[in-house]
Every structure is written in structure tokens, then in C-alpha cells.
Swiss-Prot record:
GO terms for molecular function: RNA binding. Residues 21-55, 363-398, 437-470, 529-562, 576-601, 615-719 are annotated as: Disordered. The modification Omega-N-methylarginine is found at residues 363, 681. Residues 654-673 have a biased composition (Basic and acidic residues). GO terms for cellular component: cytoplasmic stress granule; cytosol. This is La-related protein 4. Interacts (via N-terminal region) with PABPC1. Interacts with RACK1. The gene is Larp4. It is found in: Cytoplasm, Stress granule; Cytoplasm, Cytosol. Residues 376-389, 460-470 have a biased composition (Low complexity). It comes from Mus musculus. Keywords: Acetylation, Cytoplasm, Methylation, Phosphoprotein, Protein biosynthesis, RNA-binding. Residues 439-448 have a biased composition (Basic residues).
Amino acid sequence: MLLFVEVTSKGTGLNPNAKVWQEIPSGNPDGTPVTEPSWHETAATSGSHPEGHTELSEDMCKEYEVMYSPSCETTRNTADVEESADGMILGPEDLSYQLYDVSGESSSAISTEDLKECLKKQLEFCFSRENLSKDLYLISQMDSDQFVPIWTVANMEEIKKLTTNTDLILEVLRSSPMVQVDEKGEKVRPSHKRCIVILREIPETTPVEEVKALFKNENCPKVISCEFAHNSNWYITFQSDTDAQQAFKYLREEVKTFQGKPIMARIKAINTFFAKNGYRLMDSSMYTQPIQTPTQYPSPVFMQPVYNPQQYSVYSLVPQSWSPSPAPYFETPLAPFPNGSFVDGFSSPGSYKTNAAAMNMGRPFPKNRVKPHFRSSSGSEHSTEGSVSLGDGPLSRSSSRIFLSERHNPTVTGQQEQTYLPKEAPILQMEQNGDFGRGRRTLFRGRRRRDDDRIPRPQPAATEAKAPTPKFDLLATNFPPLPGSSSRVPDELGLENRMSDVVKGVCREKDSEDVRVSCPVPAEDGQTDCTSAPLSISPSPPCTAEPPVLSTTQQEQDQMEDSAVPKDTLNPVAVPVSSPTATKPSPANTASPCTSNINPPRAVALQEPRKLSYAEVCQKPPKEPSPVLVQPLRELRSNAVSPTRNEENGAPEKPVEKPHEKPETRASKDHSGFRGNTIPRGAAGKIREQRRQFSHRATPQGVTRRNGKEQYVPPRSPK
């Protein structure tokens, strides 16, 4: 034998030998090559004794030596050269090892049973769940039915070491209960048969012999194994699915009881043989985590509640906190990566953002946060023009808020209007503080109130003029227009002023009835003129003051306010509404009563106030009761406002009705106009003035807030 091995090892350098190995799967189990006649002869001799290598005579060995020893030497040398040329390091040892396997295979045929046993163990291991969870190659070779070609199995290194005889491999596979061979004998797959019977409620202390004794019966097939699993469960394995079914039926129908208890049995599939998906799940758990996402998905879902509290807390603080919610959902698909900390990692950034929002309190309305800066810049520009810069920022904001109030007020009675105005005052104060000290918390509160106002206000908006409604809707519902309002002073401020005029008309039932200012304020001088020119009162049309373009000094504004103050009728022309807007040179846009439509460009604006005036007209009946209520409210506001104004401290306590009488001093005028106008008018211009005054002092805000809250506590509790 040794001599034969050596001789054949020399011959392994021949190319025909390599071809022999290539032809093994094709059904040449004996490795019989036909390329060269000499090799064919020797191979035929060896093939003629497949089981009798022990019978190989020394003559055969000598024949090998005689025939091949010289050629083997040359072929070996040439083979070495070729291998070196190819950069391969296949030494003769490897070839002899392979050849030894071939000879070993044929020699092991002597003990076929041993070979079959080894093959069976190896094949069953290859198709075991443990191996399938790691053997990606074998899984990749499976088709949709988990069938693997038998030649693929035969080519596996572990099998080749044992045998290359596909017929023998097929025979072993067919004899194994662990695998299933197709009818043609070409493919094999793991067996899905349920071969295990589970006995429940049998204590672990029960001897194995007693459990096995249950199945010792003619009607029960042979038990392959019996073992205790866990939780008083015993696994009894049978050879096949049919055996397990038969044993199960036997227990149910014949035995029925064990140890005085009814037998609780069920059939379980051998966990080694689950469907392909089962292998993939196992595989994914050990290797590919992305495939594991289905199993991991419950964990993100479970962890979601951990994240939700933050969402809700954020939501309570910030109405727009829905923005963080999408992020978690975008992140959750990534969460399946087993480290659940990833979810926590994401949530922590979210919490950080929410904290930042809580600190700034302006985050929910980032555009609003930017607004103050725009207004401050615009205010600086106005200051260069000679108008009070601080007023502009608050004016635009207040105008927007007044606009909201106006939208709501047209349908509201005078009392409600009064209650609303006090609320507006604290808001204005807050925003003044925002402009003065950039206190964003106050700004946020003001905006919050604005939102509160906005929620109910959209309903009465229907009463507004049809033309302005689109812009009003944009202002009310969409924040983007609000920042634009600062930049677009002429358009949006005009709208705001008109609205404020409407509000003025609604609230100034008592004041505006007597006098209506019809003169448009051309400029600072023009404003004085308008103050001096009261017109006959036409209560039906509310004055449509569109002075937003006017940017005048406080004196002019005061004069305007004075002129507006004498108005006792619901039709306050709201000339004072002319706010210190950036454009002084546009006097044509100054307030003009609806009756005297002096400015044709205001036709649109007039139309808007006309409808508003209609609402005012509807509200005119409450004019009479309202004067009494409005006056005390004015006094309260004047009290609150007077301390707030540092510039004009002299006139903090002056009565509201007298403001028109006080054109002498700007401070008194401003206060009077402010007091008189704040409650009834809600005019953006006056509110702006108020904001200027407030901006000088931050402390009086608390007082005004108190007054406003006290006045309208029943309707609302702004926070």
C-alpha cells in the first residue's frame, strides 16, 4: 500500500489527475480518466478492483514504477517549474494528501458501514440548524424550497475527505431522517418533519425509564431519544414524522394518563429543521443585523414611550414641537441597530433642542424671534429720519395684534372690546420689553397671547372687508407674513392701521361721534392740520385711517392723537392711527374719514374699512353703554400707561376724555391720545406710541398687566 501511495503521488503531478477530480461530480466516482492511454490502462486496473486495493499485487506496483517512474520524475520537475511560474505553492505533499484521500476512500470501502456512519453524521451536521446558522454558502445554494444539489454537498471539503462517491452520499442522505431527498435523487433539503413528541407537566424527578416505558408498546413506534427539556417538559424523539404522529395518537387514545394525571402531549418540530426563514433568522441574529430588524423592531416600538414623554413635554411648552416628532420616526428605522442607546442618543439631542427652546422661549416662532431685529434695524433707519425708532418695532407687532383684535371685535359688544383692550395692553408691554431688553420670554408670552387671540379671531374675520381678507388671513394664520410686515411697512402697516382704525371706531363710540377728522395728514405739518379739521360725523362709515406710510415725529403723532381724541362717535377717523412708519413723505396715505374719500389711492383701504364700518355700525347700539365702561377702562390704562412713559410723566393721571383739550404739551397730548385711543381705538399708531413709552420703562408693564388682567379676567386668562 505504501508503495502504491508513493507511486501514485508521483503521478499526481500529471494533468490527467487534476481532471479526475474535476470529473468526480459528473459521475466518475472511481476517478477514471481517459485522457492518456498509459494512465487509462493503470486507472482501469485500479478501477477493476474498486474494493480490492488490498489485492493489488506487487506486480501492479512494479508496473507503475516501471511505466511511470521516469515520466513521473520529469513530470514532477516540469510541474514544479510550472507551479513556480504560476506563483502557486502546491507541493507534492498536498497532491499526495489528496491522492491519499482517494486511496483511503477506496480502502475504507472495506468497512462501508463505518463510512456510511461517518457520512451520515457529517451530512446531518451540515444540515443542522447550528451549521445552517453559520454556513452562508450552503444557504446560498438553496433554492426557494431549501433544496441543495447533491453534487454541491458532495463537493464540500468535509464530504470529499470521506468520499467522492455521489451514489454513496445519496444513499446516506436517503437513510437519514434529518434530510429529505427529492424523487430524482438530485437535490436534498433539511427535513421539516415533526419528529418530537412533547410531554408536559411531568416533573424532572421522574426517572427516564418510566417515561420511556410509556412508549413501550406494539402500537407505539420505537423511541430514538427521551430527555427532559425544561419546565416539566420532556422531549421524546422518533425516527420520522409518521412515527411521531403514531406515538402521539397512541398517547392520546390508549395511555391517556401518567402518574395519575392526564397526559399533556403535543408534537414539536425538531428545532434543527425549520423553514429557510428560520435559518435566516438565526443567521441574522449571529451575523447580519440589518436582517435582524424585524426582531429588533419591537424594541424601538417599546422604547418609543420612553421618548414620548419628552415629545409631550416639548409640545406643552412649544405648540410647534411637532418638528421633533418626525425626527424620531426618521431615526427609528435606524434604531434597529441593536444598541438601543442610539434611540437615547437621538432623544438626548432632541431634549437639548427643547431646552434651548425653553431658554429662549422664542423658538416656537423663530420668525418672530428674527422680527425684533428687523424692526430694530428699521427703527434705526427711522430714527435717522427723525421719528422715534423704538416705536416702529412695537408698532408693527402691536398692529398685527391689534389687527387680530379688530378681526374679533367687529362682532363683539363694547364691553367685550373693552375687556380685550386691557389684555392687549399687557401684550404690548411685554413686547416693548422685548424690544427694549430683548427679553424673549416676555416676547414669547406675548406671542402666545397673540396665538390665543388668533384662535378665536379667525371666525369673525368673515365680517372684515373682502379685499383685505386674504392678507388678513395670511397675517393671522401664517407667521411668514408677520416678519414681512416689518419690511413691507406701507402695505401691511396700512392694513394694520386700517384695522386699528376700525377697532378705534368700534371702541370709540363716545369719542368719535362728535368729531371726524377728514384731512389727510400730508406730513408733520399736515398732521397738525388734520388735528384742527374736525368733520361732520357720518357714523355709518368707519374712518379708514391709512397713515401707515406716515413717519412723523412724536409731536405730529401727538397732534394726530389729539385730533383723534375729540372724536366721540363710533366713526373715529382714527387719524391718530398714523404711526411713525418709515415713510414720512407719503402724507397722501394719512387717515381720511370714509365720508371724505380725499385720497383715491385709498379706495381699496376705504372699502375694507367700509365693511369694518358696517361691523362698527352693527356695534353702534352698544356705544351708549360702552362710554361709561370705556372711560373707566381708559382711566385704568392711563394709570398703567402713565407710569410706563418716562418721557411724559407729567400727564399720567389726566382724564381720558380731555385729551383733545390738551394739545399744548406733547406729553399730555400723547398721554391723552394714548389713553383715549388705547381702549377705544386699538389703533396701531397709538399702540406703537404706547410701546415707545413702555420701551422706556420695563417696570410699569407689571402694573399694566395687572390692570388688563383684572379688567378682562372673566373672558380670558392669558399666560
